[in-house]
């Protein structure tokens, strides 16, 4: 493992030139102090976890110091926000500090969020508050532990720097890791500003660095777009299967890598509600849980439009047509596994849909239902789960069909509990748990943030003394809508 001064840098995106980003130095925050760090994220950089305890760690990730090899850049892009095109967005408070090359040959972006004003700040102060920084840290690491593709969070650094949102809060910086920070909106920017040469440079960069397997295809650009469609189909299937609501699926928040990116007012479902809206600014429900599948397809079509400079329209349409069937296949596979099924039958999707309809009628905690279902033999588990349902007749009918379906599985029930527990988390990042940790951190106590992070790092394993993190939320903690304010 390495010390901070032993990291290797290779700033590929910065070398593309000033048409793609602007060099900006971070603005330091006062009295930097470590709030929380992720050892598993540090390992991606080959970084010794003990480095997080050194004063220089907080200084480097709060803008006070820079590596000599760093080339901090604010990236320019545009995007569709709530369906309307915004011609110039860009990194308004974040900087791509550098790209680290690890010993495995992987490049990882170091992105500092809350680093101060940039040419793209759009009247903002360029800061991030402690509250939103902790939320992104927890979500990144929780999703990773669930097996959902996501950007990673290296650390959160707190400060005494005041910032004003609805009230006075303290500034913080979050260091995000991803193998690229290129968004759908990057391609939209060069398309709508009619810069075809820069557009092609960017496409070639993404193809070369992130989709090298597509270079030998007969149509490399089309092969790359098809792979992006495939990755997003799997990503959204995992969101839906695990009840994750992103909240702000604007095209500038969509990663070209097909990973969860740019967290805002996200939430995991508590009681199942297909129409749940986690963002209180989303008054029309554009980004509700139920709409995430069609919105992902819409966003991919926006990307396809931006790529018409290098790919013919009809092949793009054909590639877009892959999204829904791929999504459905991934989603059904995940839901079969969550139900403990190891084989496929034609009516399995109907079985899943009937279960969700029963849940929708009220009273059922989405995550805990699946965990309970695997605790005991099927008949006994159904009796226990029944108590949570309002639609008892509907659940009884479903339960009878599910019991019969399980009876057609090959072999016996040996290993069913282990199989189901391996895919059904006991611990989920619920907004009320995050809020309690944030309130403690705002009072200067970071222990709850760190404890919650450690629990969520092993979501499928029962952890002694951590039962409180596996309980149903209190009524006040359910279906919290979160502000975009950050």
Swiss-Prot record:
One of its GO terms (molecular function) is AMPylase activity. It is an enzyme of class 2 (transferase). Mg(2+) binds at residues 253, 262. This is Protein nucleotidyltransferase YdiU. Nucleotidyltransferase involved in the post-translational modification of proteins. It can catalyze the addition of adenosine monophosphate (AMP) or uridine monophosphate (UMP) to a protein, resulting in modifications known as AMPylation and UMPylation. Its cofactor is Mg(2+); Mn(2+). The gene is ydiU. Pfam families: SelO. Its EC number is 2.7.7.-, 2.7.7.108. Belongs to the SELO family. It comes from Pseudomonas putida (strain ATCC 47054 / DSM 6125 / CFBP 8728 / NCIMB 11950 / KT2440). It comes from the Bacteria. Signal peptide: none annotated. ATP binds at residues 90, 92-93, 113, 125-126, 176, 183, 262. PANTHER family: PROTEIN ADENYLYLTRANSFERASE SELO, MITOCHONDRIAL (PTHR32057:SF14). InterPro entries: SelO. It catalyses: L-seryl-[protein] + ATP = 3-O-(5'-adenylyl)-L-seryl-[protein] + diphosphate; L-threonyl-[protein] + ATP = 3-O-(5'-adenylyl)-L-threonyl-[protein] + diphosphate; L-tyrosyl-[protein] + ATP = O-(5'-adenylyl)-L-tyrosyl-[protein] + diphosphate; L-histidyl-[protein] + UTP = N(tele)-(5'-uridylyl)-L-histidyl-[protein] + diphosphate. The active site is at 252 (proton acceptor). Keywords: ATP-binding, Magnesium, Manganese, Metal-binding, Nucleotide-binding, Nucleotidyltransferase, Transferase.
């Amino acid at each position: 493992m390495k010390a901070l001064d032993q990291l290797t840098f290779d700033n590929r995106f910065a070398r593309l030139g000033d048409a793609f980003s602007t060099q900006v130095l971070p603005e330091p925050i006062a009295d930097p102090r470590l709030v929380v760090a992720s050892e598993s994220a540090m390992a991606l950089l080959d970084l010794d976890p003990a480095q997080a305890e050194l004063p220089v760690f907080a200084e480097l990730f709060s803008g006070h110091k820079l590596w000599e090899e760093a080339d901090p850049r604010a990236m320019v892009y545009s995007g569709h926000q709530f369906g309307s095109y915004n011609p110039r967005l860009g990194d308004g408070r974040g900087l791509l500090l550098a790209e680290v090359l690890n010993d495995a040959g992987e490049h990882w972006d170091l992105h500092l969020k809350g680093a101060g004003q940039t040419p793209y700040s759009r009247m903002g102060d360029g800061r991030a508050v402690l509250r939103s920084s902790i939320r992104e840290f927890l979500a990144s690491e929780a999703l990773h532990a669930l097996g959902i593709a996501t950007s990673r969070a290296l650390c959160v650094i707190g400060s005494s720097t005041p910032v004003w949102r609805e009230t006075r809060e303290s500034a913080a910086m979050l260091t995000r890791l991803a193998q690229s920070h290129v968004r759908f909106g990057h391609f939209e920017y060069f398309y709508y500003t009619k810069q075809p040469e820069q557009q092609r440079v960017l496409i070639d960069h993404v193809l070369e660095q992130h989709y090298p397997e597509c270079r030998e295809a007969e149509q490399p650009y089309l092969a790359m777009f098809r792979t992006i469609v495939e990755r997003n189909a799997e990503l959204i299937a995992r969101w839906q299967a695990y009840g994750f609501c992103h909240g702000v699926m604007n095209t500038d928040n969509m990663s070209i890598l097909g990973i969860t990116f740019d967290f805002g007012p996200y939430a995991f479902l508590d009681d199942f509600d297909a129409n749940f809206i986690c963002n209180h600014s989303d008054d029309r429900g554009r980004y509700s849980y139920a709409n995430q599948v069609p919105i992902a397809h819409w966003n991919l079509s926006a990307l396809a439009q931006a790529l018409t400079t290098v790919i013919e329209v009809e092949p793009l349409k054909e590639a877009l047509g892959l999204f829904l069937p791929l999504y459905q296949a991934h989603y059904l596979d995940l839901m079969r596994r969550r139900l403990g099924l190891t084989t496929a039958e034609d009516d399995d999707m109907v079985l899943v849909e009937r279960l969700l309809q029963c849940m929708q009628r009220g009273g059922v905690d989405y995550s805990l239902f699946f965990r309970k279902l695997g605790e005991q033999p099927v008949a006994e588990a159904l009796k226990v789960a029944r108590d949570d349902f309002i639609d008892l007749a509907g659940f009884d009918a479903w339960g009878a069909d599910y019991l019969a379906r399980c009876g057609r599985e090959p072999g016996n029930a040996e290993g069913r509990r282990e199989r189901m527990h391996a895919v059904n988390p006991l611990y989920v990042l619920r907004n009320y748990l995050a809020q309690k940790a944030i309130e403690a951190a705002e009072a200067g106590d970071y222990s709850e943030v760190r404890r919650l992070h450690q629990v969520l790092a092993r979501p499928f394993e029962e952890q002694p003394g951590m039962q409180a993190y596996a309980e149903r939320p209190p009524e006040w903690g359910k279906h919290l809508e979160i502000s975009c304010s950050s």
